Amino acid sequence: MRWITRSHVHVDRVACPWLITRFVDSDAEFLFVPASQIEKVAADTGAIPFDAPGVELGHHENRCSFESIILKYGLKEPGLLRLAKIVHAADIAEDIDTDPIARGLEAIASGYSLRYPNDLENLDAQFEVYDALYAWCRLDVAKNKA
């Protein structure tokens, strides 16, 4: 399937494609366009919009888009839910200090945006970061259960 969001990816617009690819649609194709073109391009291509104003898989009821995707697709793995807390805090400015990892993730996202201005290249580079962070989240959850 095709998925569409705003260009110039940052925390949520990198985390969401990672989540979609790893847990929802392993053959996902991502399109990045200016916010003003999302509705038209989504209609023309059949792409599913995310992390854009007014879309189902966006910010709603104090959720970031990553959390909206988790909710929509019924994802419940504890490590993934731990990662969602980090992504939320890193993406929502007023919540940045609600998780000790958030400022680091936001800084990493900023650095990758400087190194990789092309959105697809940025995703390719950052997916490894999210794979590693997810592995850590699974370990963190396991340690805190004991």
Enumerate the language-model features and the residues they cover.
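Extended, well-folded catalytic/binding cores that form a central cleft or groove in large enzyme
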Residues: M1-H8, W18, R22-A146
